[in-house]
Regions:
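Extended, low-complexity, turn-rich repeat/linker tracts enriched in Gly/Pro/Ser/Thr and Asp/Glu
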Residues: 310-327
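C-terminal membrane-anchoring or membrane-association module
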Residues: 476-484
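Alpha-helical segments with a strong preference for the paired helices of cellulosomal dockerin domains
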Residues: 100-108, 181, 185-186, 195, ...
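Short beta-strand-plus-loop segments that form exposed binding edges in beta-rich domains
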Residues: 370-378
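Short, threonine-centered small-residue motifs that mark membrane-proximal processing/anchoring sites
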Residues: 10-30, 389-399, 403-405, 413, ...
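Beta-sandwich interaction modules
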Residues: 353-362
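N-terminal secretory signal peptides that target proteins for export/translocation
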Residues: 1-10, 483-484
Length: 484
């Protein structure tokens, strides 16, 4: 059983930072990864890097033994610290205030990664053994006999059991790290970080913060960017939970969009600060990972699609400057459902640079897919943006249909100005109005030939009508002056 004791988690933070230099320098680094779970009670075995996991966690009843202690005493210790009334000290722990703090701590893992934590009681409300134990079991005992010693320690996968120090203060009280939410919450998250395979992190000049730093921080809410990055490298992003989105059959549904619709996802990875309920994370954890998304367009439309690598930049003691937005060269393709016919793709840039397709035409309503993948074996968070618009109506100032744009067309526009609604009445831009915008189209196209049967041949000037340009433009100005 591989074990790592948190000598760094001391009650005195100043002492902890000193101890960090003494004991932690050999291992501390950004996204320090030791190993991961390869088998769990619910997932079975043969789990690989990038696979999501569901881990059961449980609390060892007092007086029972487990891998970390022959006589766990955690429950009474926490009950005393949280002033739980005697009538509420029942065999079921889920009504305790400290249990709620632990549960909130474990819920964060599922919001930011492919790790799902599920509580399972080891005894029922009558105190009878349920026959179940967690993949991660939490208990406690007097670890070193001194109030200034270690707060807790934990084992790495495939074990993950936690032992919390139940040593009381010199006055017999329970220390504040165990009896208030910030301390207990981040202690549980930190130790469980070891329990899922993470090591310690260490930053230069406070350029970032992490719950996996050696000293217990209470100025953050649990897992921060560096912690989340490591979790996603090992277990994938939150979309990998419940079957994942690694194929078109399990694609994440983005929604149904009209020609004014838009969506932006993956926005929580843009900076190093993670709040309690941040759950908008998208990432490619390596070359073996692909992310599929599905969306519906309700009518023919055009779309702008952009894939942007995101992440903060900070400095670590061991690795130097770490730019989390430039870890992988991402690309994407768009497919038509259900045939998976390729519509378009974008793979033109490089590591850390955005890929985009502008004005992509979806000529028919229906379902489409986007597939995202990376070329490097590294985790890369990204943001995906889609915005939809109407299919542009071709501008046409040949109002009389004689295949050229000339003075006759100007006269048609002049007669229809303010009243007309169709092309034959001077509506050049298809907005069912004949106004100054249509006149601008006529001016841009004046002197051009219109050749619908072979549009690829382009348009050429009509020399005979170019001579009309000067007097006609003068006439336009005169009309404007009269209108004024």
């Amino acid at each position: 059983m591989e074990q790592r004791r948190d000598f760094l988690l001391m009650r005195n933070i100043a002492f902890a930072l000193t101890a960090l230099t003494m004991f932690g320098a050999g291992r501390a680094a950004a996204y320090d990864i030791v190993n991961r779970w390869t088998s769990t009670q619910l997932d079975g075995g043969n789990l690989q890097r990038g696979d999501a996991v569901t881990l059961r966690w449980s609390i060892v009843p007092d007086g029972q033994s487990y891998t970390r202690s022959n006589n766990s005493q955690l429950v009474q210790f926490l009950d005393d610290g949280w002033n739980v009334p005697a009538a509420q000290r029942v065999p079921s722990f889920s009504g305790r205030p400290w249990w709620g703090v632990m549960n909130q701590a474990y819920q964060q893992f599922g919001r930011v990664s492919g790790v799902t934590m599920v509580y399972i009681p080891e005894q029922n409300g009558a105190g009878v053994d349920t026959g179940f134990e967690g993949d991660i079991r939490i208990g406690g005992e007097n670890i070193d006999g001194t109030p200034g010693g270690a707060l807790a320690d934990n084992t790495f996968p495939n074990d993950g059991d936690m032992r919390i120090d139940t040593t009381r203060e010199t006055d017999g009280s329970v220390g504040s790290y165990f009896s208030a939410e910030p301390g207990l919450r981040n202690l549980v998250i930190h130790e469980s970080g070891h329990g899922v395979g993470l090591g310690h992190a260490q930053f230069v000049n406070n350029s970032a913060k992490a719950v996996m730093e050696g000293g217990l921080r209470t100025d953050i809410w649990g897992l921060q960017f560096d912690d989340v990055y490591a979790l996603n490298r090992q277990y994938g992003d939150p979309k990998e939970r419940n079957g994942g989105n690694n194929s078109h059959a399990t694609a994440t549904m983005l929604g149904s969009f009209t020609t004014t619709g838009s969506i932006s996802i993956g926005r929580d990875a843009v900076d190093s600060v993670v709040e309690q309920f941040d759950d908008d994370w998208l990432g490619i954890d390596g070359t073996s990972d692909t992310d599929w998304f599905r969306f519906t367009v309700s009518s023919p439309s055009v779309a702008d699609i952009k894939l942007t690598p995101v992440g903060p930049t900070y400095e670590t003691v061991q690795q130097g400057v770490f730019n989390a937005a430039a870890m992988n060269d991402l690309e994407f393709q768009v497919f038509k459902a259900p045939s998976l016919g390729l519509v378009d793709g974008a793979a033109e840039t490089g590591v850390g640079l955005a890929e985009s397709i502008d004005d992509l035409l979806f000529s028919t309503a229906g379902d489409y897919f986007i597939r995202v993948l990376g070329r490097q074996d590294a985790n890369q968070f990204y943001q995906l943006d889609l915005s939809f618009n109407d299919v542009p109506v071709p501008e046409d100032a040949d109002f009389d249909g004689d295949l050229d744009v000339d003075g006759e067309d100007f006269l048609i526009w002049q007669r229809g100005a303010g009243a007309g609604t169709t092309l034959s009445q001077g509506d050049a831009n298809g907005d069912s109005l004949v106004d100054g915008l249509d006149l601008e189209v006529w001016k841009e196209q004046f002197g051009m030939l219109v050749d619908p049967p072979n549009p690829s041949a382009g348009t050429v000037p009509e020399p005979g009508t170019l001579l009309l340009a000067a007097p006609l433009l003068g006439l336009v100005m005169a009309v404007r002056r009269r209108a004024a």
